[in-house]
Structure formats: C-alpha cells, structure tokens
C-alpha cells in the first residue's frame, strides 16, 4: 500500500505541479489535484479526516469532507475517472 507521500507525488506528477501547490488553499478556488490527493488518502490509506486536514493545512475537517464529495461528483465524468484510474494504478 502506498504512503501519503507517494500519493502526493503521484498526483503532482500527473498534474505537473509541485507538492507545495497541494497545500495552498484559497477561498472559492478549486484545487482539483489537492481534492484528488485528499480522496486517495482517505480511501486508499484510510486516513482520518482530521489527519488529512493537518497534512493539507486545512483548519476544518469539513473542508476535507467537502473535497472528497467534489471528487465523488467528478468521478461521474469519464475523463476525470480515467485520470483517477491512471493515478490509482500508479500507486500499486
């Protein structure tokens, strides 16, 4: 099973961003890469919402829950689901 750092690296590699970009949070600006990393940490690693929030500098665990909900909605989009599959497969 992949660690949290491996998940972050895989997401950053696919989105071609630096890991620091995952921790940047700006009000009303979506960060698809961060949301996906959060989702993977929750469902691949089984991390607690509070711990994930700490890793991404999110002060409220409900922000983590909202990110997970956004990914669940996006997974209905074929292109996003394909991207998710590539990243997920690269972890194992």
Task: Go through each PLM region and give its residues.
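Basic, alpha-helical nucleic-acid-binding regions used in initiation and control of genome expression
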Residues: 1-36, 40-92
């Amino acid at each position: 099973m992949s660690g949290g750092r491996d998940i972050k690296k895989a997401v950053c590699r696919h989105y071609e961003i630096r890991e620091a970009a995952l921790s940047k949070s700006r009000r009303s600006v979506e960060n698809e890469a961060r949301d996906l990393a959060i989702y993977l940490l929750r469902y691949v690693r089984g991390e607690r919402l509070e711990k994930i929030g700490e890793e991404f500098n999110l002060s409220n665990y409900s922000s983590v829950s909202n990110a997970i909900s956004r990914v669940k909605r996006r997974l209905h989009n074929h292109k996003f689901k394909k991207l998710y599959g590539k990243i997920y497969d690269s972890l194992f």
